[in-house]
């Protein structure tokens, strides 16, 4: 695919892997990321083979027919790259190697998932719907030999499934369980971060309860599997109507508090340190001229669409592209003077004076071409002096998932807990993991230098787990 798009070897795989390790503070396993980076393309090709009706686009917003969009398309993200963006010159790069399935379906990529499921069923796979895993089974040698499930749609009867080769856990994350979150990611609970899993925003199960409850984590831990330390909450901020585009940010005291040109996860971290976990994004009437100089990162605007461009293309919409007119109402506050704007935001007294002084200082730095206060790239420093002025209030973001499962490796193995009697940390025979219950992929923070990386590792290691389980690797 990347060869088709002219992106073959555009990023060295070790550059990507090393960046991912840094963003996770080296508490994850490089071997997992390296194997994925070297071979993910092979599994992606296999994955889409199941759906021959897929239309592969050459650019992010290539014109397609409604029929093509209804059946499903695959697009390269941020391609072609913005004229003024080169990831190699960025402190926080977003690598141009991501792609996205799109369709008229609510679940977007559901068509290719269903195609692979149907292929498995045709090959003899048996499915059990509405069932909950409750317990893993082991033999006297410690090998996992099966699982007990509860069939919620048939009188809650329990069924024992015996495994000739092994058991693969693909049970998702644990963000919907507050007890697990308090232990492994307490800052999410302490900061009262909105939890999409616990709130049922990611769907509910057949009993009407929220999902992402850590069932696989529990089942593994109950038989002695080591749970990964330092879970990684996926709390990357997506901003407001203007996304996370790096315009000026002030806290409630009127102070500028960061280099705004950082990714959404780092933005969230900084906002959580501010009074009331609140900030204001400010920009002026010339924002449309400034957007093309902004980074092509996750959640930010960096392309301006001509006003006369036809919008009938089903593949027209993309988060990084906008017409200026499309953002005419994408603000919370608007005024012809900065003082009036800040007053609307709630600033008064000393905080108002501080905010005005902060903007004056920012304007001086922008004109001088050097951010001596926070080190923001000069090419993204734009003085606020063109009315009308706009502002959006930000709070904390929502957590999509909390990534951190059973400790694993590049072969999807699981390992025993630390034990002075067995310091070598034995592999648990017959138990494999993939998806968000596979630990050691990320740690501390979810990295966003490559968009969609969670899905990519889920697909890749789902394939590896299946192959290795059958082969007894």
Stretch-by-stretch model annotation:
Residues 36-157, 178-179, 366-386:
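Conserved redox-cofactor binding core of oxidoreductases
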Residues 135, 348-445:
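A glycine-rich dinucleotide-binding beta-alpha-beta segment and adjacent secondary-structure elements
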Residues 154-157, 162-237, 449-451, 455-464, ...:
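Glycine-rich loop(s) and the adjacent beta-strand/alpha-helix scaffold that form part
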Residues 159, 297, 307-311, 404-473:
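C-terminal structured subdomain/cap of oxidoreductase catalytic cores
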Residues 150, 163-164, 169-171, 252, ...:
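Short, well-ordered coil/turn residues at beta-beta hairpins
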Residues 213, 217, 223-347:
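An anion/pyrophosphate-binding glycine-rich loop and adjacent beta-alpha core
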Residues 27-32, 50-64, 226-230, 258-259, ...:
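A short alpha-helix-loop-beta-strand transition element characteristic
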Residues 1-55, 59:
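Redox-cofactor-proximal catalytic regions of oxidoreductases
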